[in-house]
Amino acid sequence: MRFPENLKKGGTIGFVAPSFGCTTEPYKSAFANAQKKWKEMGYQLDLGPNCYADHGIGISAAPEECGKELTEYYVSEKNDCLISCGGGELMCEDLDYVDFEKIRKAPAKWYLGYSDNTHFTYLLPTLCDTAAVYGPCASDFGMEPWHKSVVDAFGVLTGEVRTVRGYEGWER
């Protein structure tokens, strides 16, 4: 299993929207606040073309566009890890347009997302022998303060957290 390098201070976080983007409230405002927080923490941001797209049916853009964005941003040297903008329902339609061979040959990179993103967090390990994180999407990082699960997920990306156990209750 390939484990990606940790996100370093001052590194670049990439964002993709292979399912829903951040076009409606509360996701739009939460993603804006998350971006502000990451910049204050010293990180650079690399937003994919579908992050604010809403011309797809049940997803941010056409499946061809979503698959292309996911492939291009995963293999890009312009970002150090990827966080999905949101979950959703139809990411399964993107998979025919994701170049898993290209991704398998690229350096390992952390991918973080939940819900519909299971289509990628499951296939990265099984098809590309690369670890992925099933965890919060981009807008979740806009909450104040960060829930412990959000702190831990970011800690996995940075290498500060190696073990995650569980949480009392749920996020509010």
Give each language-model segment a name.
Residues M1-K78:
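ATP/NTP phosphate-donor binding region
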Residues T12, E77-D80, E101-A108:
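Short, surface-exposed connector motifs at secondary-structure boundaries
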Residues F20-T23, G86-M91, G113-H119:
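Gly/Ser/Thr-rich loops at beta-strand to alpha-helix junctions
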Residues Y27-K28, D94-Y97, L124-T126:
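Short amphipathic alpha-helical segments
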Residues G67-K68, Y73-V98:
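Long, hydrophobic/aromatic-enriched structural stretches that serve as scaffold segments
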Residues V98-L123, A131-A138:
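Short, acidic/small-residue loops that bind anionic groups at enzyme active sites
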Residues T130-R172:
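Conserved anion/nucleotide-ligand pocket segment
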